């Protein structure tokens, strides 16, 4: 983040770097737990893994207070409109993390008539976390990958 440190004690950097640094340290996740992956998602916020170390302090219950949606579990056709509605209510900038084989592509229930074959057909997904169910470590790694993606993004449009 810091490109230049001068002798007088000044630090020079770009506006994008400062804003993206602040975004990575203040993710506000919202739980969208649909199946067994939700247990691992909640497990990651407990004392053993302490998701708060990575800037995701408290899981939000309201989409208007969240900027990260973690879709964990099997998404059925009846739940798909609700997922889209909740996503549309989230504040900008917003990110989606798809957790588990069922959320990524239907998983074990891929050929069922009532299962959406991946939540990326309903909302844009930024990070995919594989596994059935993925461990809490895998979810934390996915959040770290999302933070890397945020650091590479541009806040100010390039001319």
Swiss-Prot record:
It is found in: Cell inner membrane. Binds 1 [4Fe-4S] cluster. It catalyses: a quinone + NADH + 5 H(+)(in) = a quinol + NAD(+) + 4 H(+)(out). Its main location: membrane. One of its GO terms (cellular component) is plasma membrane. Belongs to the complex I 20 kDa subunit family. PANTHER family: NADH DEHYDROGENASE, NADH DEHYDROGENASE [UBIQUINONE] IRON-SULFUR PROTEIN 7, MITOCHONDRIAL. This is NADH-quinone oxidoreductase subunit B. It comes from Verminephrobacter eiseniae (strain EF01-2). The lineage of its organism: Bacteria, Pseudomonadati, Pseudomonadota, Betaproteobacteria, Burkholderiales. The gene is nuoB.
